[in-house]
């Protein structure tokens, strides 16, 4: 079962949309997280060496006093990530009445598992050799690690049909029974699982592609009817993609993507991106009742919500939190790549509501018609100290990502006139700078300070949004008439360096 504070969701409209450079398709092949390395253009740069010889710098042939140079092809910005910790293998197994698929860590010490008959939701994260070490609540189609989306104008049955909930919520009760538009990864309130369209190995990741179901099959009814659970669930015209990948022995990267095929847009509101339900002692698994922020402080979860649940909003000093057992030596952490430090915890006390614990980051965004939306989060296994150390290390290894939009291809320059470059970059913390190199030498720098709402609509919640863009002017005074390689680099405060794009510039 799922718990959501209803009637308090933001109503600001989301009007920006991404473009092909903001959310490009993944390159084919296994190494989907590799840096750009292939060549798209070969021309010649001045070396001072004689024609008919080879360049003393590059070893390439000299033609008209210019050595061959090339620029690497652009890559999908979403592939700009650290390499995985390795691949421990994928296995499938029947667990009770369910079909699950598991990805092992490189040493096979830790395992993460997804349920194929519940929309590929994460239902296991624990020790490979101990099935009773599971830190994830796998109670039903609404309680796992999963995605769920909302629309403030269609938040409740009765008013959802006319998209009028922002002005009047109507007469249906403030309960998850009467949720409106709400594609849920796991399935619906009848415990019918969402279908997994495909699953398998992509690079070192386990990929699952899902068509979510409306949580409430009666979501668009004009009244408060409740139809009996019979027949199939109601699929939504969006797809969820989840990729699970070990980036450290104890840390799984959770890569999520939503692609809408709808013709309607959904305004900005709070989303579950994702929500982590943790084990509650059922089935011999550990009970993890202690929620801690990154400083080890337990936030209050005592505000009454709907359906007898309690919640609490809080801020963590770092962008991660953890649910632990009573001795704080075993549990699971959730970190947000976007740098989000605001969280919301939920619980049921076993009296007014079933006994459960969950947490999610406080993130709000809209879903445009035909939009693509991407996000990253991380799960870490262990005691409080292990979780913190592992998540901090993963965050420091995560570098910037972005794209060079201008120029989109090879550049024709006029000697003495500056080159104009523009693009965007995001990172998991502030302080990232842009550097432009020409033939390997620094030629210009820039701040990331331009509004790029289109970028932040695809990658919502990242530090600095909506100011994700940069513009830079590169002087060409003193350049030779030969072609030059222009490389745009993002450097962050952790020392990570990422090439955003390369272009060949040739005199016109």
What are these regions (language model features)?
Residues 247-297:
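Acidic (Asp/Glu-rich), glycine- and aromatic
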Residues 7, 11-67:
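Ser/Thr-rich, Pro/Gly/Ala-heavy low-complexity intrinsically disordered linkers and tails
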Residues 399-508:
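Long, low-complexity serine/threonine/glycine- and acidic-rich segments characteristic of extracellular
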Residues 1-4:
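Bacterial N-terminal signal peptides that target proteins for export
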Residues 307-343, 357-369, 447-482:
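Short, solvent-exposed, Trp/other aromatic-anchored flexible loops in extracytoplasmic proteins
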Residues 63-183, 376, 381-382:
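Beta-strand-rich N-terminal accessory domains
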